[in-house]
């Protein structure tokens, strides 16, 4: 401890603290600093290492020097939250290389596991030095727990299964682009900070008040983030949209979510409120939704005050500049190679809608998950076949494990089986993996049965 304290003071490190919401108890910390090319030797005290990092980084380097967090609650990963914040801040500050070199002993097993899941690699012969390339990160949005209905979403067995699957998924993603950073963003954290940003822009309290006083602006979520949610002291109205793919996945279009009016009618309803609008989405990178909505918003004369998103990339900022829209975000990443939303990788839990004349099971839309054996992932040409296979396998196995626990807990709670026809009682907006128009699902069977079959089909393709 004294070595850590002395090192932090001598190196003039920055310290990021994590405190509990009740009482402000300290839950963890990370110490770090930024290094320019000329500062590498002074921090590393190794000429060969400093030169190698200098050639690889070609810019600012993030140096993490110590980290520790409370691990008493296995369902609360405090260390992950801290590491995410440090890495995200470093990326927004244009750091393109990351190092972990602790003061004192090599990292504990928990921290070593965490570093591995972020894409850090241990330098050969030096267990106290870990490196990661931050120039083209992959982002994983952790949101699976937000897809489960109440009260099952608070079940400890289910949350533990979700966490196990999440950690396996992180590890699998590091193999797509070895040596490169995998940044995990919590949907819960994004949700809370978006609420704070919306109420701040609307100049109203971030918590409900007894005498309700509405702000001048209205909040309009147009993606999956905040869909169906109410923002404190703010008029909130969702534009219900859905990205729908053709059966061969060659085309996609923005359409109203099933059972909702046409998008233009929804926007006219927004216009009728006669308020400036705060548009809200989870991600602004390819900008598919905003590209489709922008012409209609302009045609109807909707006054857009600002666009708020959870994650904004450099490409997304350029798109907003081109459209002349002000934009702000919870996280800003100048460079983004690939992004994944956790729930869309889990069959029956999420995915993208497929255009079909009828639903395979009443209450379930036909969907596609961009993993094997359902589809060829868009990144397949850039990654090894083994990495793509292992990612698909992890997604199927984790989905099976999570849904199996969900089925058990549903039966214990309600005294009946969780079949496909009852899946909407346990999962918010579930999808059924599309099998074409000739194969039918049995609505009386469980989703885990079909996941076992799909896993067998995947294993047949692997030699």
Predicted features by range, described:
Residues 35-37, 71-72:
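Short coil/turn motifs at secondary-structure junctions
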């Amino acid at each position: 401890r004294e070595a850590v304290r002395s090192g932090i003071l001598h190196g003039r490190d920055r310290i990021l603290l994590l405190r509990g919401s009740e009482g402000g108890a300290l839950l963890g910390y990370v110490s770090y600093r930024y290094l320019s090319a000329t500062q590498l030797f002074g921090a590393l005290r190794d000429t060969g290492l400093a030169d190698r990092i200098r050639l690889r980084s070609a810019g600012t380097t993030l140096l993490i020097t110590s980290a520790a967090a409370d691990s008493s609650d296995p369902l609360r990963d405090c260390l992950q939250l801290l590491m995410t914040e440090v890495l995200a801040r470093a990326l927004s500050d244009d750091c393109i290389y990351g190092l972990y070199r602790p003061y004192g002993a090599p990292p504990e097993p928990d921290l070593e596991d965490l570093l591995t899941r972020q894409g850090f690699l241990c330098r050969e012969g030096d267990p106290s030095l870990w490196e990661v390339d931050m120039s083209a990160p992959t982002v994983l949005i952790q949101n699976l727990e937000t897809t489960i209905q109440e009260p099952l979403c608070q079940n400890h067995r289910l949350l533990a299964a979700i966490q196990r699957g999440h950690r396996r998924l992180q590890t699998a993603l590091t193999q797509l682009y070895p040596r490169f950073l995998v940044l995990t963003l919590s949907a819960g954290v994004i949700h809370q900070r978006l609420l704070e940003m919306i109420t701040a822009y609307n100049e109203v309290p971030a918590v409900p008040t007894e005498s309700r006083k509405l702000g001048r602006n209205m909040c309009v979520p147009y993606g999956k983030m905040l869909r169906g949610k109410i923002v404190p002291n703010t008029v909130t109205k969702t534009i219900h949209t859905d990205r729908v793919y053709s059966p061969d996945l060659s085309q996609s279009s923005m359409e109203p979510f099933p059972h909702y009016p046409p998008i233009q009618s929804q926007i006219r309803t927004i216009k009728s409120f006669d308020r400036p609008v705060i548009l809200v989405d989870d991600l602004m990178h390819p900008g598919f939704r905003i590209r489709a909505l922008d012409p209609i918003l302009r045609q109807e004369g909707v006054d857009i005050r600002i666009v708020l998103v959870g994650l904004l990339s450099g490409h997304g900022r350029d798109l907003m500049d081109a459209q002349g829209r002000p934009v702000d975000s919870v996280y800003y990443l100048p460079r983004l190679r690939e992004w994944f939303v956790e729930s869309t990788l889990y069959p029956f839990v999420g995915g993208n809608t497929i255009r079909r004349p009828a639903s395979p099971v009443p209450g379930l839309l036909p969907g596609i998950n961009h993993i094997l054996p359902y589809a060829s992932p868009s990144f397949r040409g850039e990654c090894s076949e083994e990495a793509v296979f292992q990612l698909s396998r992890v997604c199927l196995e984790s989905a099976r494990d999570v849904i199996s626990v969900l089925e058990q807990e549903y039966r214990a709670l309600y005294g009946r089986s969780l079949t496909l026809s009852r899946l909407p009682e346990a999962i918010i907006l579930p999808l059924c993996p599309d099998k074409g128009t000739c194969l039918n699902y049995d609505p009386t069977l469980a989703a885990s049965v079909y996941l076992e079959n799909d896993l067998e089909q995947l294993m047949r393709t692997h030699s």
